[in-house]
């Protein structure tokens, strides 16, 4: 055994050995417990960042631990390879997106291997490969045949620079989040999948997900947004038209004082024909569409259309206003406004001096509507025959009357909208539909799949290469001219089923092999950032149910247990330029001065020795130039050190603060473990079966207490940082242990053997090497997790503290099973106890078993 720990030499040797021994190749083994561990696959942007490293280290630690517990483990890896960044990079680098993407994949694959992650590379997939997306296209055509896919014109946020549709959340202050261009409103035909058909099941099945964080489930519940209410028809005065609205508060119907309609509503369009001022306002509303989340905080603007609606109960005429807070995409694009009992309606009514009519007396008695709306429920007032009813009673009574009159009905509503999957981009999966000359659309026949994306293209930054290529667009359908759809899928499509494709990634004649898919699915452990709590995780759950209903999988849900890791933070530094802007400086270019407590007291630029400003801890990002390159850290410290720091610095779901001193501390710990093993190997032999003295028994007790704690922390609790802390504490005990006798060496050998196995999932390279140095032949990856020897935990003796009148006077070692009487006898035989009790009246003796004996004397 080498005396010095050499990470780079050990790590390259171990990685080569794992590859040669095919250690991580997963095969179906019916009858054996399986464990499918999956970390969210990366976008191949060019290089891994520390957020990736944290995510994938967590997954690898869990996978390796489960393998040592005897499970049949699968841990695959692939690439979420489509998306706009590849197009932007292609334009910038004058290359094709495909070439840029595949080069990045090759580089990042080697980065992952250098970190020692135990992936089954035979299952590797890239979503930009036709072998992958052909099945996505096939599945889409099957959904179309089932009536779950449809095409409709939809008003979209159009970015005129990126030439693409933006989600509401991608519009910031009326501008595109990526390009900064002023966003326009545009109506274009788009393809949708009916996720709303599954809204109830998606909501109900959240209750099955015991292994998911409550926060994520709450976010999905809110996004799906189930509500019970009533749909009500308001007649339009002097017209045959009706305004249909949905409300969850029919008990406030008598408080309606105006109606609000979206700028795109037909009534608004009609009124604008004869009202230029209204037409101008509507145009402004259309071009300032914002995310739904912003509506609560933005200024409420509106204009009277001059049209009146008729109250369904009182016959009163109510003004109809165009309001910028009403969205055409939600419900019917119209709302009934009750300003006394809805804060948004109250703000609008106050601004435009519309009537505010209270119809609920709150239970709290606070009924001042001058300051704000009263949103709580209570007793109905000013509502004719419903006065005196509770809100719940009035809900039922009013809903019943509306139904009897034929102008309303109860309805369960969902906030969730159907999934618009069309994107006006090139680098994505072509939507497998054909547009015929008669205006109809039909699926591409199965024998013509996949519809391949041409990869050898030149990006001009304006038009999609497939849109501007007539040869690609043109085709035939039943002998008639047709054109390929030139939109591509939302990239959430690819990431909604990749976890299932891993189960049979090499199958080329089907989307999934049901037998293999049903063996591995559902995923036992899924790991990724909480930023994916809604869209990706919701779409993947939806897709899984679609796969089930197509007969490809049997389970209802894709992921049993979900772990959302926290962000990685790092110190940031900057200098101010002449205009007061911040020029961010990489931490690698800064020399740091620390105070006595280790906090940063000052910083200087390495190049010129001049001070730089300290920007504090923030998420690692390009914008603040505070990212730490994982490759640099692996080359400097070794992969095991980086992995150990990542797992030790914080609980997995909390933010992790990068610290060079913390990384150095992690390496010192590994060097200590190496040194101790070296000393044991050079100390002479050790035979098992030696009788042990009290100190040796105590060391074994510490070992097996640690095994018990680490087993629970690594498995049930997933508190890896406390598991590592316990192992570090154990190593402190082991370093103090003598090596003189065979019994000493026997206990130390057992302890190091178990320590190496406990650390193996976290620092696999050094542990594999130490495992060999300890004399083992089989790979550590297939060794058993250390078992707790319950007999070692049984203590022969206990240390008892003796207090006399509240002061510690003696410490006794007594047999572990000693009775209170025996402990008292031993205590009173002690000289120190006799000294403080002699000639005094012993008034009371209180014994806390195994801990303390209190004696009160007078």
Swiss-Prot record:
Gene Ontology BP annotations: leucyl-tRNA aminoacylation
GO cellular component, one term: cytosol
Reaction(s) the record says it catalyses: tRNA(Leu) + L-leucine + ATP = L-leucyl-tRNA(Leu) + AMP + diphosphate
Molecular function via GO: aminoacyl-tRNA deacylase activity; ATP binding; leucine-tRNA ligase activity
Protein name in the entry: Leucine--tRNA ligase
N-terminal signal peptide: none
Motif ('HIGH' region): 42-52
Location of region: Disordered: 602-631
PROSITE patterns linked to this entry: AA_TRNA_LIGASE_I
Cellular localization per UniProt: Cytoplasm
Domain of life of the native organism: Bacteria
Class of this enzyme: ligase
Motif 'KMSKS' region, residue numbers: 619-623
């Amino acid at each position: 055994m080498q005396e010095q720990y050499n990470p780079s030499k050990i790590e390259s040797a171990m990685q080569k050995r794992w590859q040669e021994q095919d250690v991580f190749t997963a095969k179906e083994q019916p009858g054996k417990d399986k464990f499918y561990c999956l970390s969210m696959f990366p976008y191949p942007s060019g290089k891994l960042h520390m957020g990736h490293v944290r995510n994938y280290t967590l997954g690898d630690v869990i996978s390796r631990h489960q393998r040592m517990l005897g499970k049949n483990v699968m841990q695959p890896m692939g690439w979420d390879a489509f998306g706009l960044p590849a197009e932007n990079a292609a334009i910038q680098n004058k290359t094709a997106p495909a070439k840029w993407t595949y080069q990045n994949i090759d580089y990042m694959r080697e980065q992952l291997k250098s970190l020692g992650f135990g992936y089954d590379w035979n299952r590797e997939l890239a979503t930009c490969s036709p072998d992958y997306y052909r099945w996505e296209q096939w599945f889409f055509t099957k959904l179309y045949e089932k009536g779950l896919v449809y095409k409709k014109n939809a008003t979209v946020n159009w970015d005129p620079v990126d030439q693409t549709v933006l989600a509401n959340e991608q519009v910031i202050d009326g501008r595109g989040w990526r390009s900064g261009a002023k966003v326009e409103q545009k109506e274009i035909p788009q393809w949708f999948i009916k996720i709303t058909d599954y809204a109830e099941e998606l909501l109900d099945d959240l209750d099955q997900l015991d292994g998911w964080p409550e926060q994520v489930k709450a976010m999905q519940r809110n996004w799906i947004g189930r509500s019970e209410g009533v749909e009500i028809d308001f007649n339009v005065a002097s017209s045959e038209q009706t305004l249909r609205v949905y409300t969850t508060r029919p008990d406030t119907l008598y408080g309606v004082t105006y109606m609000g309609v979206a700028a795109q509503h037909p009534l608004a369009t009609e009124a604008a024909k004869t009202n230029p001022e209204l037409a101008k306002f509507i145009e402004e509303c259309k071009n300032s569409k914002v995310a739904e989340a912003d509506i609560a905080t933005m200024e409420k603007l509106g204009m009277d259309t001059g049209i009146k609606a008729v109250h369904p109960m009182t016959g009163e005429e109510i003004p109809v206003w165009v309001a910028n807070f009403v969205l055409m995409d939600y419900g019917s694009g119209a709302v009934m406004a009750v300003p006394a009992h809805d804060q948004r309606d109250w703000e609008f009514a106050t601004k435009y001096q519309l009537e505010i009519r209270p119809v609920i007396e709150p239970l709290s008695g606070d009924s001042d509507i001058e300051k704000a709306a009263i949103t709580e429920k209570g007793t109905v007032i000013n509502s004719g025959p419903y006065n005196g009813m509770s809100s719940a009673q009035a809900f039922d009574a009013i809903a019943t009357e509306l139904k009897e009159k034929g102008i309303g009905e109860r309805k369960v509503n969902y906030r969730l909208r159907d999934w618009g999957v069309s994107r006006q981009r090139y680098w994505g999966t072509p939507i497998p539909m054909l547009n015929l000359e008669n205006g109809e659309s039909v699926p591409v026949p199965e024998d013509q799949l996949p519809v391949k994306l041409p990869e050898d293209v030149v990006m001009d930054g304006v038009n999609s290469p497939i849109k501007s290529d007539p040869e690609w667009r043109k085709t035939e359908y039943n002998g008639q001219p047709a054109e390929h759809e030139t939109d591509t899928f939302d990239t959430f499509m690819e990431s909604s089923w990749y976890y299932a494709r891993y189960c049979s990634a090499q199958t080329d004649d089907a989307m999934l092999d049901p037998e293999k898919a049903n063996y591995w699915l559902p995923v036992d452990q899924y790991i990724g950032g909480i930023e994916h709590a809604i869209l990706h995780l919701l779409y993947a759950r939806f897709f899984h149910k679609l796969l089930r209903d197509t007969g490809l999988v049997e389970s209802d849900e894709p992921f049993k247990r979900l772990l959302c890791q926290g962000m990685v933070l790092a110190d940031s530094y900057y200098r101010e330029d002449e205009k007061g802007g911040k020029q961010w400086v990489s931490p690698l270019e800064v020399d740091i001065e620390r105070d006595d407590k280790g906090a940063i007291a000052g910083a200087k630029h390495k190049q010129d020795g001049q001070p730089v400003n300290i920007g504090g801890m923030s998420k690692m990002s390009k914008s603040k130039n505070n990212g730490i390159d994982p490759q640099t850290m692996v080359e400097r410290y070794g992969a095991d050190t980086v992995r150990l720091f990542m797992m030790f610095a914080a609980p997995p779901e909390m933010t992790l603060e990068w610290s060079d001193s913390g990384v150095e501390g992690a390496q010192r710990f590994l060097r200590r473990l190496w040194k101790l093993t070296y000393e044991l190997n050079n100390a002479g032999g050790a035979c098992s079966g030696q009788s042990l003295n009290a100190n040796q028994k105590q060391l074994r007790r510490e070992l097996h207490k640690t095994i018990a704690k680490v087993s629970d922390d690594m498995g049930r609790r997933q508190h890896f940082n406390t598991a590592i802390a316990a192992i570090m504490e154990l190593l402190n005990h082991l370093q103090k242990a003598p090596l003189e006798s065979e019994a000493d060496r026997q206990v130390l050998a057992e302890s190091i053997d178990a320590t190496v196995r406990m650390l193996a999932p976290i620092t696999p390279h050094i542990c594999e090497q130490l495992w060999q140095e300890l004399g083992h032949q089989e790979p550590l990856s297939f060794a058993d997790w250390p078992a707790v020897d319950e007999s070692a935990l049984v203590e022969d003796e206990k240390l008892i503290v003796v207090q006399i009148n509240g002061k510690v006077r003696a410490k006794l070692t007594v047999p572990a099973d000693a009775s209170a009487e025996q402990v008292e006898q031993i205590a009173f035989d002690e000289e120190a106890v006799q000294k403080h009790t002699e000639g005094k009246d012993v008034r009371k003796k209180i014994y806390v078993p195994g801990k303390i004996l209190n004696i009160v004397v007078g």
